[in-house]
């Protein structure tokens, strides 16, 4: 297995090194080919390394900085004034070819702004998109993009998102022909605004994309399609609503299983099955959103992620780096555009 190096913004997120460093250590024990740059305050990071075995420790290099991007920093401010921040230095390691992917749980807007400026977009891609997974009834995750990187999009941008989402699904899930749909207010061809309708027409002209038409919100988790495309305004609200509903259902189920002797007894008897269902519904199981369309790999973790959830995001970054996702997107987009022009 070829060695991989990830650059980790160790100070990002609600808990900083208290979560990011132990999760990185878990990943190093899980992947023998993995190395880390841990970017952040050396003193804070080393608190979590004192008891670490030597074979793991030698695969870590600390890049010291005391500057951080705060959650209240506006993207433009962070771009201009946080040039020595842990987030920026981590992205620069990818730009300079020292790391194959960057991971941060920090300020999403700042991460997107810095990534776009430092890494640049791929040829043929106007804007990067934020993409993550939703659970589905058939247990195969559904990719949803954009999740907030672009609050409004033209039809060409939505088309590019569809291409990138399709390639991501191929790369991560090894799905050779992912089904792609546009999120809309109805499935009829006459429904939706001009941007969505025109994006649908572009996708219909692309034989390399398995475009299935429009999909409504009530079909998000049906597993009928593999990739769902929308603008960032719709996508962000959809994702946050889905996560809220999932947490509500998990809470209500856990609460209900503690009421009454016979209910508790039955719950113990079927505990493995219950835990499996709860795990599938838990948003932490799907932690890790990819900022795709860039010349390098950037993965965003939830700021509130615990150690297990953060490890999920690291694993996603590892998979994308192994599959060389940016190169796959670039090659596929070039091929698709050539098909359309011919």
From Swiss-Prot:
| Gene Ontology cellular component list | cytoplasm
Q: Give the family from UniProt.
A: Belongs to the PlsX family.
Molecular function GO labels: phosphate:acyl-[acyl carrier protein] acyltransferase activity
- NCBIfam families (UniProt xref): plsX (TIGR00182)
Q: What does this protein do?
A: Catalyzes the reversible formation of acyl-phosphate (acyl-PO(4)) from acyl-[acyl-carrier-protein] (acyl-ACP). This enzyme utilizes acyl-ACP as fatty acyl donor, but not acyl-CoA.
Stretches of the chain forming a coiled coil according to its record: none
Q: Keywords in UniProt for this one?
A: Cytoplasm, Lipid biosynthesis, Lipid metabolism, Phospholipid biosynthesis, Phospholipid metabolism, Transferase
InterPro entries of this UniProt entry? FA_synthesis, Phospholipid_synth_PlsX-like
Q: In which pathway does it act?
A: Lipid metabolism; phospholipid metabolism
Q: Which GO terms describe its biological process?
A: fatty acid biosynthetic process; phospholipid biosynthetic process
What is this protein's name? Phosphate acyltransferase
- SUPFAM superfamilies the record matches: Isocitrate/Isopropylmalate dehydrogenase-like (SSF53659)
Q: Tell where it localizes.
A: Cytoplasm
């Amino acid at each position: 297995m070829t060695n991989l190096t990830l650059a980790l913004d160790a100070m990002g997120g609600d808990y900083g090194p208290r979560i990011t460093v132990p999760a990185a250590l878990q990943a190093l024990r899980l992947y023998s080919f993995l190395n880390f740059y841990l970017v952040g305050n050396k003193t804070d990071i080393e608190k979590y390394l004192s008891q670490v075995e030597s074979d793991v420790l030698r695969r870590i290099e600390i890049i010291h900085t005391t500057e951080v991007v705060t959650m209240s920093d506006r993207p433009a401010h962070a771009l201009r004034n946080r040039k020595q921040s842990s987030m920026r230095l981590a992205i620069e390691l990818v730009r300079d070819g020292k790391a194959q992917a960057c991971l941060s749980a920090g300020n999403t807007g700042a991460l997107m702004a810095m990534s776009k400026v430092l890494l640049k977009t791929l040829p043929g891609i106007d804007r990067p998109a934020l993409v993550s997974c939703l659970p589905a009834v058939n247990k195969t995750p559904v990719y949803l993009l954009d999740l907030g990187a672009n609050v409004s999009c033209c039809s060409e941008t939505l088309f590019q998102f569809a291409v990138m989402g399709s390639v991501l699904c191929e790369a991560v899930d090894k799905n050779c022909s992912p089904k792609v749909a546009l999120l809309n207010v109805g499935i009829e061809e006459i429904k939706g605004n001009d941007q969505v309708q025109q994006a649908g027409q572009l996708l219909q002209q692309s034989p390399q994309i398995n475009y299935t038409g429009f999909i409504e919100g009530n079909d998000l988790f049906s597993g009928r399609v593999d990739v769902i495309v929308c603008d960032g305004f719709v996508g962000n609200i959809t994702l946050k609503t889905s996560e809220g509903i999932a947490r509500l259902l998990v809470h209500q189920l856990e609460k209900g299983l503690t009421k009454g002797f016979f209910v508790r007894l039955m719950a113990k008897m079927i505990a493995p099955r219950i835990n499996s269902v709860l795990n599938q519904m838990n948003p932490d199981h799907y932690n890790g959103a990819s900022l795709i369309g860039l010349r390098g790999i950037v993965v965003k973790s939830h700021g509130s992620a615990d150690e297990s959830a953060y490890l999920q995001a690291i694993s996603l970054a590892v998979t994308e780096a192994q599959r060389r996702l940016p190169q796959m997107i670039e090659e596929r987009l070039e091929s698709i555009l050539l098909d359309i022009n011919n």
